[in-house]
Amino acid sequence: MKKLKLHGFNNLTKSLSFCIYDICYAKTAEERDGYIAYIDELYNANRLTEILSETCSIIGANILNIARQDYEPQGASVTILVSEEPIDPKLIDQTEHPGPLPETVVAHLDKSHICVHTYPESHPEGGLCTFRADIEVSTCGVISPLKALNYLIHQLESDIVTIDYRVRGFTRDVNGMKHFIDHEINSIQNFMSEDMKSLYDMVDVNVYQENIFHTKMLLKEFDLKHYMFHTKPEDLTETERQQITAALWKEMREIYYGRNISAV
């Protein structure tokens, strides 16, 4: 896409929001409580602040303020306000390609924020536990928050990911014409690295005329030992392993498709 010569500041708002899910099976009530305590500590407010601060570093944002809070009995929230410094728009890379992991890239934001909220969850029956992290990166200006996508998914262990990207508002060029998007995008997947795409089954639901893009991701490989908390699969009977595998897989598909699935 040809670079636009704008009249004044770029007023487009670009928002990237996604849910990241981690699934676990805890055989007993003690294991369930242990998993919730473990995941709550692993992703406490301090750890999340480190992750979001590194996100700011990746996209070159200047941190204005950090608000963070751990909650009882569980959960945490962090919000970071960021700003930009003057930058030559000619230096901005707006092409469709994956962003970096922890490497630094120049990017500048204004009236923007990055926030995360966590939601550990379990049910007393069935042994299934889930951890959900809601993340939003919202920027105002020429930079797309999609550049932070790779890093954030790699930092948070993810069995299932749902991603939404939307461009809102408009900006004007020097001739007064409105522009409702200032970069090319066909799919959120184009901003992911090849190694990440190889790990997940993915599907897109995009509304191009509204500048709304949606991608869902489900981890391809299933290894039961990665989903057990303090219990080894070899300590279970074959029937137990099959039942737990079926329950976990059903849980993951229900979250992925966003609907309850009847037992076969």
From Swiss-Prot:
Q: What is its EC number?
A: 4.1.1.50
* Gene3D superfamilies registered for this protein in UniProt: S-adenosylmethionine decarboxylase
Q: Which SUPFAM superfamilies does this one have?
A: S-adenosylmethionine decarboxylase
Reactions catalysed = S-adenosyl-L-methionine + H(+) = S-adenosyl 3-(methylsulfanyl)propylamine + CO2
Give an example GO molecular function: adenosylmethionine decarboxylase activity
Q: Does the keyword Lyase apply?
A: yes
Q: Does the keyword Glycoprotein apply?
A: no
A GO cellular component annotation here is: cytosol
Q: What class of enzyme is it?
A: lyase
What cofactor(s) does the depicted protein rely on?
pyruvate
Question: In this record, what's one Pfam family?
Answer: AdoMet_dc
Mind telling me how this protein is modified after translation?
Answer: Is synthesized initially as an inactive proenzyme. Formation of the active enzyme involves a self-maturation process in which the active site pyruvoyl group is generated from an internal serine residue via an autocatalytic post-translational modification. Two non-identical subunits are generated from the proenzyme in this reaction, and the pyruvate is formed at the N-terminus of the alpha chain, which is derived from the carboxyl end of the proenzyme.
Q: Which residues form the active site?
A: 112 (schiff-base intermediate with substrate), 117 (proton acceptor), 140 (proton donor)
Pathways involved:
Amine and polyamine biosynthesis; S-adenosylmethioninamine biosynthesis; S-adenosylmethioninamine from S-adenosyl-L-methionine: step 1/1
Modification sites for Pyruvic acid (Ser): 112
Subunit annotation: Heterooctamer of four alpha and four beta chains arranged as a tetramer of alpha/beta heterodimers.
Q: What does this protein do?
A: Catalyzes the decarboxylation of S-adenosylmethionine to S-adenosylmethioninamine (dcAdoMet), the propylamine donor required for the synthesis of the polyamines spermine and spermidine from the diamine putrescine.
Concerning its family, UniProt says: Belongs to the prokaryotic AdoMetDC family. Type 2 subfamily.
Database matches in NCBIfam families: SAM_DCase_Eco
Give the protein name, as stated in the record.
S-adenosylmethionine decarboxylase proenzyme
Q: Which organism is it from?
A: Salmonella typhi
Q: Which gene encodes it?
A: speD
